[in-house]
């Protein structure tokens, strides 16, 4: 089988498949396809996988060809469905594989990477493998895998969070600087000038004594008292 014929048929099949289900009559094939999740190989079909948005999940497929003729694996895709109502939520990007020829009675392995980015909820992942056989492309569904998807917890040391914190800090510092330049300088200048005026007024109102002055034992200045009055006080004291 020529590779160009395989790829032409593969493209035509994708174009005519609605929801990855063939529009013609279903055919039975003796091709067994299973997979494991490399990150959690212990999970089975009955388990529920727990994934976070941003994770990369690797599916490792095993294709067993029990047909009498050779088959060729040419592509892989898949869907996330709502496990309650079976509605399709999103389709995975169709990926090219190989092509990898599988002779009768033999098996091959290949990987598919899936980037998890969905609204947090419960889903069922159903992969599909494209097989070329006898100039036809066959879409073979694999078992479903239940999964719970949640948002990843944000770490304090996450570079994106650190960058956001720096942006907020710089913005806050810039607002403070602008506020000081517009209102702060004028306010502090006004307060300083008022204090200077109060100090000058206090100095001007203080009396300044000129010339020598004497104080009596009574503790007040006697220069301004007439001498006759002072003599009278002294005479009274002698008596």
UniProtKB/Swiss-Prot annotation:
Ranges of compositional bias, category Low complexity: 201-213
Keyword tags: Endoplasmic reticulum, Membrane, Signal, Transmembrane, Transmembrane helix
Subcellular localization(s) per the UniProt record: Endoplasmic reticulum membrane
Residue ranges of the TM segments: 162-182
Topology feature Cytoplasmic, residues: 183-239
Record's bilayer topology term: Single-pass type I membrane protein
Endpoints of the signal sequence: 1-19
GO CC term (a single one): endoplasmic reticulum membrane
Pfam family, one: TRAP_alpha
Residue span of region Disordered: 201-222
Organism superkingdom: Eukaryota
Its job: Is probably involved in a pathway contributing to genomic integrity.
Similarity comment: family membership: Belongs to the IRC22 family.
This protein's name: Increased recombination centers protein 22-1
């Amino acid at each position: 089988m020529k590779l160009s014929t395989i790829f032409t048929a593969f493209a035509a099949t994708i174009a005519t498949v609605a929801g990855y289900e063939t529009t013609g009559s279903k055919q039975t094939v003796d091709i067994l396809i299973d997979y494991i999740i490399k990150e959690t190989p212990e999970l089975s079909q009955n388990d529920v996988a727990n994934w976070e948005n941003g994770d990369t999940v690797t599916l490792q497929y095993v294709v067993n060809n029990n047909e009498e003729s050779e088959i060729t694996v040419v592509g892989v895709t898949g869907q996330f469905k709502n496990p309650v109502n079976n509605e399709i939520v999103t389709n995975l990007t169709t990926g090219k594989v190989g092509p990898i020829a599988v002779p009768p009675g033999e098996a091959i392995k290949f990987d598919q990477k899936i980037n998890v980015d969905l609204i947090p909820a419960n889903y069922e992942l159903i992969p599909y493998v494209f097989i070329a056989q006898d100039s036809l492309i066959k879409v073979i569904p694999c078992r479903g895998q239940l999964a719970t998807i949640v948002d990843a917890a944000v770490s304090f040391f996450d570079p994106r969070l650190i960058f956001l914190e720096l942006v907020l800090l710089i913005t806050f510092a810039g607002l403070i600087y602008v506020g000081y330049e517009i209102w702060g300088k004028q306010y502090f200048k006004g307060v300083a000038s008022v204090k200077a005026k109060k100090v000058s007024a206090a100095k001007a109102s203080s009396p300044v004594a000129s010339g020598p002055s004497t104080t009596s034992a009574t503790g007040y200045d006697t220069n301004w008292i007439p001498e006759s009055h002072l003599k009278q006080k002294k005479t009274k004291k002698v008596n």
